[in-house]
Amino acid sequence: MRLEIRDLHVHYDKIEAIKGISVVVNEGEIVTLIGANGAGKTTTLKTISGLRKVSSGAILFDGQDISKVPAHERVDLGISQAPEGRGIFPGMTVLENLEMGKFHRKNRKAEMNEDLDNIYTLFPRLKERSSQAGGTLSGGEQQMLAIGRALMSRPKVL
């Protein structure tokens, strides 16, 4: 797995939010974006996930230019995101929230059960609360749920 960002520029109308960043992430690496408020960290992640349009430059994943690939197809390629601010479905149960993470992997019940077991091993508190509405969890538990949901898609990049 290799994620490569080449001279990425992203605009919000006439405002250039990302001004020519380049990054390479190889399999097994952990990379952190650090910067002041408004520096473009969230915009960068949204652009990698396909939620923001690339103005110029390129995003390559395993050698394939995915700059114009829609967000839902990027999930199929193995790119997932645990959204900022937890971003869970508050009216859905913990289990239903987790199931949403594997939505693109239809008809794979055995894999889903295996993945649920893995998530519950990582976050035992989620198993205890599997039938509880996500919105009733504490802030930390909601973050666990958001990460667990992202992991349910079996991402190559999170």
Model-predicted regions and their roles:
Residues 1-158:
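Glycine-rich phosphate-binding loops of nucleotide-dependent enzymes
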